[in-house]
């Protein structure tokens, strides 16, 4: 797809390198190598449309003041056949490029021709990428950490798809290990209590105390009566887990679907034990000399591969640890299913996980750089200016379902992606339901609805958005028009950086800026009633803004209402 900003950066790169070659040839600069030219969009309007710090980078090598180097480079530039209007040296040695408006008109042409494909990139080149996220314990409802991880992971996956990767969304079901054992004990206790009274058995202090455990057992008793009351405890727990666990998983699936998160694969941890992959993984580690025994347990020699400490992979009771299954799971991802890259999203309590898992990959000759681990921080909910811990509906800890009922899917997904994953997030529940410009998601959706309304009104009077090549766009030169076009031009670059940094929070900030620029344009520039060519040019600008806002909201999986 066409990326006008990328074209301009290539032009600047070519102009600067040719200028340096010319300056070297005529003896103004000594011979030196330019490895990579860093080109950015300045934050200050007066600093031009694009800027580079090449003069400051080269100053030490060429033994001249950065400002002098900048002036020599500028003096030797040939700007013909480029979008560049003029170039200035600024500050300690920045080189600032000011462009003609022609590039902005070309941006509108690209948007009008590519429509929903605007911003699509090919940096992924079809590489197979797995994004594994949420992966909550299937022992209860989804909490706020799962909610943030869900919005973040799904948007990362969408950004990567937009950037040209072949993405698989995966949920790892933790259906083996301690939490399932505890789940079975909790179910058994509630089952017996419901049939024989609360005093019949003590509920485990570290068990799952949620109402859903009681609900499951009431439903089981209604269907099956006391058929398990007098069977062996192990068999009873197994049967109750087999009854309740699929219901919990289905509930999680429905909650996530209501949230706009749909997984391609639901992968069972237990399947790694059932098909022998955990055993095979442990055997290979032993054969390679990466295990040792100590205190009756089997340890992984992670320290031999760069970790700070070794890790237990089989407890002294002979049961593999969660980490052992996780190593097997990552072997499955890379060696059996052959993903080129894997991205795991984990809560802040998994901070030490990245280093040890990368060491485990090294043990199997898998490039550890193929694994990215995104750690996201905690969420605090606020209501009436105070931390909200309980659901207004249930009186229990706020679940994802409670949040969706209170603020809706759009607000939840937008708010969870307003901060970088590594930052703590304060979620204002009152703000999320406000129908005013204070509410960021409302502000963006209103800009989209306004653009649709403007075009709908004009169409009702016989004016349709024309073919972009039939209109003279050079009439678009009001400051608000220029700023809006510049902002629209940045979208492909925002996708590129978001894909490289795995930070979709860039997109919420970006679309807020687009909405702000559009509202400024709306207040300053009339469309209906203007001279015909200007009216049609502005219609193209309105429609291009509509397309970009819709495009971003689609990536964020947030609805774009045509009326509000």
UniProtKB/Swiss-Prot annotation:
One of its GO terms (biological process) is arginyl-tRNA aminoacylation. The keyword Cell cycle does not apply. The keyword Protein biosynthesis applies. SUPFAM superfamilies: Anticodon-binding domain of a subclass of class I aminoacyl-tRNA synthetases, Arginyl-tRNA synthetase (ArgRS), N-terminal 'additional' domain, Nucleotidylyl transferase. It holds the Pfam family tRNA-synt_1d. Its main location: cytoplasm. It is found in: Cytoplasm. It catalyses: tRNA(Arg) + L-arginine + ATP = L-arginyl-tRNA(Arg) + AMP + diphosphate. Keywords: Aminoacyl-tRNA synthetase, ATP-binding, Cytoplasm, Ligase, Nucleotide-binding, Protein biosynthesis. Its EC number is 6.1.1.19. SMART domains: Arg_tRNA_synt_N (SM01016), DALR_1 (SM00836). GO terms for molecular function: arginine-tRNA ligase activity; ATP binding. Signal peptide: none annotated. GO terms for cellular component: cytoplasm. Gene3D superfamilies: Arginyl tRNA synthetase N-terminal domain, HUPs, Isoleucyl-tRNA Synthetase, Domain 1. A motif ('HIGH' region) lies at residues 136-146. Monomer. PANTHER family: ARGININE--TRNA LIGASE, CYTOPLASMIC, ARGINYL-TRNA SYNTHETASE. NCBIfam families: argS. Belongs to the class-I aminoacyl-tRNA synthetase family. This is Arginine--tRNA ligase. It comes from Acetivibrio thermocellus (strain ATCC 27405 / DSM 1237 / JCM 9322 / NBRC 103400 / NCIMB 10682 / NRRL B-4536 / VPI 7372) (Clostridium thermocellum). The lineage of its organism: Bacteria, Bacillati, Bacillota, Clostridia, Eubacteriales. The gene is argS.
